[in-house]
């Protein structure tokens, strides 16, 4: 804070002494970053990148590997340091897709946004292409800016069989300085326009839960959130097991979703996926990450008159 005040004072003095200079500082804010989140782009990921149509199968069907490869290509296209993290499950090798946006001044400090891209043997539009599309859209937006801390975006595999991908990542990075992890899991079912979300996490994650709730209030365009206590059934749990602050952001009506783990959990099901609601969930998460990783404003520029 002292540095920012000093820069402002020096800038003011320079402008006062040299009236031929005019400041054109952009004044980049977290709100500016959040405004770049696009429902059109989010929908394109959900409809066209992750194989969410009737008959698709991201469980053990052919669309599983195709979706993984598409996620890798997207991360790589955003300029992230992209890799596959292999792990074993039931005698076979699977991989998490990891994209790293390295921080400028505190690269050792890490914030993670994750979602599982696998499904049961169905299209898995809400569970959980909706969350994975959110990670893709957040990565697209945040990769365009600089932050003090490092942002890591992860598409986890084999969540449905017991959180195997997130367990593998958390255990491999147990000594990292992970300051916060958010799992996006089922963020697109919003019957009757209730516009509510649930936040799950243990008491040890109370701080990150509160900060995410605040971000939802600030950047969620009318979404409200409910602290729903503890739930260990998503990819935040392995991070909490290692004492990292972590939480789950999920649609409020998750327990009443009639298409959960059904063949018609698909973008083709009429009046099912609420793209606007899901996009606002993503905007909230982008705001949280930009705030906590500390957005670096664009430098001031000056024009000679």
Language-model-derived ranges and their functions:
Residues 8-20:
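Bacterial N-terminal signal peptides
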Residues 26-65, 116-118, 256-268:
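N-terminal capping segment at the start of a domain
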Residues 42-48, 83-84, 97-100, 110-115, ...:
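Structural recognition of the beta-strand scaffold that forms the well-ordered cores
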Residues 44-102:
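A non-catalytic alpha/beta surface segment that caps or lines the substrate-entry region
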Residues 88-92, 104-106, 117-122, 157-162, ...:
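Solvent-exposed loop/turn segments at secondary-structure junctions
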Residues 119-211, 236:
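Acidic/histidine-rich catalytic neighborhood of metal-dependent amide-processing enzymes
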Residues 190-295:
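Active-site-adjacent substrate-binding region
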Residues 297-305:
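A short, hydrophobic C-terminal helix/tail in secreted or cell-surface proteins
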């Amino acid at each position: 804070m002292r540095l920012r005040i000093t820069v402002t004072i020096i800038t003011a003095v320079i402008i006062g002494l040299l009236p031929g200079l005019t400041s054109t500082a952009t004044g980049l804010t977290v709100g500016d970053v959040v405004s770049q989140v696009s429902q059109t782009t989010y929908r394109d990921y959900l409809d066209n990148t992750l194989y969410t149509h009737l008959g698709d199968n991201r469980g053990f069907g052919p669309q599983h590997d195709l979706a993984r490869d598409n996620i890798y290509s997207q991360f790589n296209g955003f300029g992230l340091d992209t890799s596959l993290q292999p792990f074993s499950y039931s005698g076979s090798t699977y991989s998490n897709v990891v994209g790293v946006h390295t921080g400028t001044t505190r690269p050792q400090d890490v914030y993670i946004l994750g979602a599982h891209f696998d499904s049961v043997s169905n299209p898995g539009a809400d569970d959980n292409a909706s969350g994975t599309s959110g990670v893709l859209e957040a990565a697209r937006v945040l990769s365009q800016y600089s932050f003090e801390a490092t942002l890591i975006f992860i598409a986890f595999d084999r969540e449905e069989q017991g959180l195997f991908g997130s367990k593998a990542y958390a255990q491999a990075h147990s000594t990292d300085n992970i300051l916060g992890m958010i799992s996006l899991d089922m963020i697109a079912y919003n019957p009757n326009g209730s516009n509510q979300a649930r936040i799950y996490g243990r008491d040890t994650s109370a701080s990150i839960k509160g900060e995410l709730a605040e971000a939802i209030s600030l950047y969620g365009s009318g979404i409200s959130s409910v602290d729903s206590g503890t739930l260990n059934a998503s990819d935040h749990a392995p991070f909490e097991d290692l004492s990292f602050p972590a939480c789950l952001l999920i649609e409020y009506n998750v327990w009443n979703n009639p298409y959960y783990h059904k063949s018609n959990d698909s973008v083709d099901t009429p009046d099912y996926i609420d793209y606007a609601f899901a996009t606002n969930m993503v905007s909230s998460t982008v705001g949280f990450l930009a705030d906590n990783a500390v957005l670096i404003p664009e430098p001031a520029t000056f024009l000679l008159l």
